């Protein structure tokens, strides 16, 4: 039992209604969140002489306080529980580390609707289709739609400024609604309807309508139109034959689970209207001693009930594990979706084959992850020895990227005991410094990163600075000046200087801003881990810098030309159909723009080319 908490007095005050409880340690940190149909009965079970398992025993020893929130129903309690888990990330709960929203295909409600990739909250008016397991899958689908149905995919800002069609029109991927007379309103809306039907899985309706139109065109002797529609029919048929995998037209999520060596993998197979859209593997954080049933139960709850993810709920969820709270989860999901959602654990036929596939994928992904972790863990141990630390649970690395001091971007990448934590990678746009001053850039990013309150688990054990003694000295100065509530002495600051000719394996490490550095053997596992985090940081920084530089280049190219003000910029973009066509235009073409003289056209052409 716990000496920190007078549970007997507390239990006297607890109601038998449904609700949610939050357990705190001595530091006031939430360490566990749970829900109960009967709060008194559930909380009493924690303080019996014989607790359920080792995890519960460890949890109870750390309880210093319990807060209770009473709810009207058990369904309300379930929803609130998962909201609290997401908010507090308690260390004794199973945690789904998935803070990225799923990509969807968005069909806007504009006069001429556009197709686009969408993530996050559904604020914009229109229709949303998905979810897709990753951005690659959704972009592949958009590229396919562009080949089948010539509906625009350009941004509204580009669409409104066109006076002639773009390249997509020239190659038959867009019908050109931006330019009057290229496509009728009726025909464009018909293609939009085809997209809507196709994304809803109603391929046969699309084919039926196209066949009817082809026959009508042929009867009216419009043979060119009939041939064009015939080609569209053949393209749609090819796609549907390739993608159709089941006679079942319902939406399914199929969830397979594998568990070994304290690590769980949950693999989700997304099936929409008989088509496999893709799949994704998840590795939830599992506290020691947690039962597999709790892992699956909590995963399903967090995956579907944490509403900010923007997921579209399927009509049915298939599991290879029987949930103790299946009915409660199903009713909660049905209430959330506004329609009936079923959870099945003993499917037959095609569903059973899907489940076997999901289970196989989970096992394969788990084997791969365990192999990777074995390597990472070995490297972590070697690095801890080199740096004379007891253990390393979290590392962060910083790098600076710029071109001649312009568009400076700093990156921070994070590794934990299992390797890269990409959801915590960050970029920082650097401003207000002398161009090219890497020391000032490093000082700025470190102040922004660490000059604030941090949770204990977010304080790194090691901070790598990409650079030599100068960069490391800046880091020491920044940390000396920090006035923060957390232990700023905890992180070990390490400078990583590149070797001669920037060759891998010749890096020099510095633990102090003065004195000599030291090198590790080229085959050292510790060095390989340092190279891994350093390279990730470098790539993250340079990618951000290139994106920023490209954006500035494209937006400022015209602004820097003398004699080209806002009105002329607008006229140039509208007449030429965008910035890229303007870059490719000749002097004669530019001179045709209203308000642009021959001399100014030459100046614009020379400025854009050079």
From Swiss-Prot:
Stretches assigned to the GIY-YIG domain: 16-94
Primary location: cytoplasm
Functional description taken from the UniProt entry: The UvrABC repair system catalyzes the recognition and processing of DNA lesions. UvrC both incises the 5' and 3' sides of the lesion. The N-terminal half is responsible for the 3' incision and the C-terminal half is responsible for the 5' incision.
Protein name: UvrABC system protein C
Domain of life: Bacteria
Keyword Heme on entry: no
Cellular compartment(s): Cytoplasm
HAMAP family, A to Z: UvrC (MF_00203)
Molecular-function GO terms, alphabetical: DNA binding; excinuclease ABC activity
Record family assignment: Belongs to the UvrC family.
Domain UVR: 204-239
């Amino acid at each position: 039992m716990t000496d920190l908490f007078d549970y007997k007095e507390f239990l006297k005050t607890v109601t038998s209604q449904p609700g949610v409880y939050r357990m705190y340690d001595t530091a006031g940190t939430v360490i566990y969140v749970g829900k109960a149909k009967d709060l008194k009965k559930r909380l009493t079970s924690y303080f019996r002489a014989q607790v359920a398992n080792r995890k519960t025993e460890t949890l109870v020893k750390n309880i210093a306080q319990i807060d209770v929130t009473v709810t009207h129903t058990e369904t309300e309690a379930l929803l609130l529980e998962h909201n609290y888990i997401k908010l507090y990330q308690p260390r004794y709960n199973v945690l789904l580390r998935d803070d990225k929203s799923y990509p969807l295909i968005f069909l806007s409600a504009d006069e001429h609707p556009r197709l686009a990739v969408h993530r996050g909250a559904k604020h914009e008016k229109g229709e949303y289709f998905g979810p897709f397991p990753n951005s690659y899958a959704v972009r592949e689908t958009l590229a396919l739609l562009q080949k089948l149905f010539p509906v625009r995919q350009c941004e509204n800002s580009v669409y409104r400024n066109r006076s002639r069609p773009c390249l997509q029109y020239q190659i038959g991927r867009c019908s050109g609604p931006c330019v009057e007379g290229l496509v009728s309103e009726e025909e464009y809306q018909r293609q939009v309807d085809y997209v809507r039907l196709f994304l809803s899985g109603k391929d046969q309706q699309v084919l039926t309508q196209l066949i009817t139109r082809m026959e009508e065109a042929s009867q009216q002797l419009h043979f060119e139109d009939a041939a064009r529609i015939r080609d569209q029919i053949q393209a749609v048929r090819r796609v549907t034959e390739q993608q159709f995998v089941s006679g079942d037209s319902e939406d399914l999520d199929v969830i397979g689970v594998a568990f070994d060596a304290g690590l769980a993998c949950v693999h989700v197979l997304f099936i929409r209207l008989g088509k496999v859209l893709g799949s994704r593997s998840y590795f939830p954080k599992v506290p020691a001693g947690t039962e597999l049933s709790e892992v699956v139960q909590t995963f399903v709850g967090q995956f579907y009930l944490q509403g900010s993810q923007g997921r579209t709920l399927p009509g049915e969820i298939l599991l290879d594990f029987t949930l103790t709270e299946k009915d409660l989860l199903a009713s909660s999901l049905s209430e959330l979706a506004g329609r009936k959602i079923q959870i099945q654990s003993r499917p037959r036929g095609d569903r059973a084959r899907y489940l076997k596939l999901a289970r196989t994928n989970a096992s394969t992904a788990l084997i791969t992850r365990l192999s990777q972790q074995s390597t990472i863990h070995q490297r972590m141990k070697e690095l801890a020895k080199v740096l004379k630390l007891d253990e390393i649970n979290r590392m962060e690395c910083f790098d600076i990227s710029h071109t001649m001091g312009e568009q400076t971007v700093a990156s921070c990448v994070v590794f934990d005991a299992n390797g890269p934590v990409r959801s915590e990678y960050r970029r920082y746009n650097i401003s207000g410094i002398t161009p090219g001053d890497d020391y000032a850039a490093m000082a700025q990013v470190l102040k922004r990163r660490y000059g604030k309150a941090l949770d204990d688990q977010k304080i790194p054990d090691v901070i790598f600075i990409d650079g030599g003694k100068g960069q490391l000295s800046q880091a020491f100065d920044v940390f000396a000046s920090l006035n923060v509530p957390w232990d700023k002495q905890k992180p070990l600051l390490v400078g990583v200087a590149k070797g001669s000719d920037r060759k891998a394996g010749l890096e020099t490490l510095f633990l102090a801003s003065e004195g000599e550095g030291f090198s590790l053997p080229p085959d050292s596992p510790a060095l390989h881990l340092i190279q891994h985090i350093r390279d990730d940081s470098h790539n993250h920084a340079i990618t951000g810098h290139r994106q920023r530089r490209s954006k500035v280049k494209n937006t400022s190219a015209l602004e820097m030309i003398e004699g080209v003000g806002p009105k002329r910029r607008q006229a140039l973009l509208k007449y030429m159909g965008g910035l890229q066509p303007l870059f490719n235009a000749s002097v004669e073409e530019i001179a045709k723009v209203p308000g642009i003289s021959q001399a100014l056209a030459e100046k614009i052409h020379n400025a854009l080319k050079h």
